[in-house]
Structure formats: C-alpha cells, structure tokens
C-alpha cells in the first residue's frame, strides 16, 4: 500500500545547505528548496547537475547563464534547467526563489559542490 503520509515543513526551521539554500519538503522523487534574500554577486563557476530543476522567482532579479545563453529572471518568472546542462546564476539584486529538483538534490550530497 502506498505511503499517504503528509508532511508539513516550516521554512523557519529548515536545514540550510552549504550554498545557502533552505531545504523544504522532499518526497521520493522530488524536493523543494528556497533561496532567500540571496545578495548580488558575480557568478560562481558553471556546473552541471545530476537532476532537473524548475524554479520560480518571488523577489529580485538574477541572470541564469546556461549553455551559452543569458536569461534574465524577474518576479513572476519560472525556468527549467535540464539535467546535465552547464549553468550558473548571477544575482543582480536581493533575490528570493523557490526551486524543485527531480530527483531530490540534497540526496547523497548532489547539491553541495
């Protein structure tokens, strides 16, 4: 019989990853994370991840640098980073966004480098 347990997560008590993300709800095949009030910065080294990411901007602006494209992300925008796509972000102003990853990013340290 499938597990039908519902879990509620309060972001005020969520664990924080090494990159600054807060880990939110997580299931067997998908997880959520919150980037809260990220400050302007230069892009980090581009990376490719073993998971797909979808995101939604709540506040602020950032550039997604992905596979030779620069995409401006503003409040109300959503985006997809395909599994294996080389990418990085440049935060232009204090930035808050929610992302979902599949498979879950924080399993086995996938999210920490």
Question: Where in this protein do the model-derived segments appear?
Answer:
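A short glycine-rich, His/Asp/Glu-containing loop-to-beta-strand
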Residues: 10-45
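Short strand-coil-strand connectors
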Residues: 28, 65-69, 92
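Short, conserved beta-strand element in jelly-roll/cupin
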Residues: 37, 49-64
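Histidine-centered metal-chelating micro-motifs
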Residues: 42-44, 79, 83-88
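Short acidic-glycine-tyrosine-enriched beta hairpin
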Residues: 68-83
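Ligand-binding loop in jelly-roll beta-barrel domains
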Residues: 83-107
